[in-house]
Swiss-Prot record:
This is Spore wall protein 12. SUPFAM superfamilies: BAR/IMD domain-like. It is found in: Spore wall. Gene3D superfamilies: Arfaptin homology (AH) domain/BAR domain (1.20.1270.60). One of its GO terms (cellular component) is spore wall. It holds the Pfam family BAR_2. InterPro entries: AH/BAR_dom_sf, BAR_dom-cont. Belongs to the SWP12 family. It comes from the Eukaryota. Residues 169-188 are annotated as: Disordered.
Length: 236
């Protein structure tokens, strides 16, 4: 075990046993607020990921949909006769419309059935397009998880330097020139590392991070609902 590792362990134990009141080394402006927000966003990544996954799969429903699948005569082509497919709710509605379109070729029900079928088949396709966009955001969340690991290491470094510097400044030992020089170096490193960590946390929170993911998810859902509404307007 090298000296730095031993020092890190000793510092970690000391920080846990003795709560330090930082009177000599304040955090840089905005750091504390950004860190609090960052930790909340970081700890919510799974919730966001789960909500996106739900948006991607809700159309497959639960027991009601499974019951509908078992009762429907899903024959859309000769090649599919006798085959079972796990249709989504939009495809299932489209197939219902297709069945109605076969009842009396000249009837108004037939025409409505065709329009109904087309609308829901189109919506099913739009849903796949939305899912493709949402899949990109799930990948982004995975990247953010990796990014958070790097940020946490930098936050730990900030915490360690701050502790060492606070102890150095509070030391009652006479300051030799080398000690003053070391203290100045530590202070410079603390400020530089803090700025780097703050920048990365703000990026994680902002449009390049979690906020951007939420915006993209909302945009994908909006596009889907707008296209779906337009398709349904044709069923008259």
């Amino acid at each position: 075990m090298d000296k730095e590792t031993v020092k890190d362990i000793q510092r970690s134990i000391a920080m846990k046993l003795n709560r330090v009141e930082y009177t000599e080394v304040p955090l840089i402006e905005g750091y504390s607020e950004a860190e609090d927000c960052y930790k909340r966003f970081r700890d919510s990544l799974k919730k966001i990921s789960d909500s996106i996954t739900w948006l991607m799969t809700y159309e497959y429903g639960g027991s009601k949909m499974k019951s509908l699948y078992s009762k429907m005569t899903m024959i859309t082509s000769t090649s599919r006769i006798g085959q079972f497919k796990n249709y989504d709710i939009y495809e299932a509605n489209g197939l219902i419309g297709l069945e109605f379109s076969k009842i009396g070729v000249a009837s108004s029900l037939s025409d409505t059935g065709k329009k109904y079928s087309k609308a829901y088949m189109d919506i099913s396709r739009y849903k796949l397009e939305m899912n493709s966009r949402l899949e990109q955001q799930l990948k982004k969340i995975s990247d953010l998880r990796d990014h958070s690991n790097a940020i946490d290491k930098k936050r730990k470094k900030v915490s360690n330097i701050r502790y060492d510097l606070e102890m150095e400044k509070k030391s009652k030992e006479p300051k030799t020139p080398s000690m003053v020089s070391r203290e100045n170096d530590m202070e410079r490193t603390f400020k530089e590392t803090s700025k780097e960590a703050l920048k990365e946390m703000e990026r994680f929170i902002g449009n390049d991070g979690v906020s951007g993911v939420l915006q993209k998810v909302a945009e994908a859902h909006r596009m889907f609902t707008e296209k779906s509404a337009k398709a349904l307007e044709e069923v008259k």
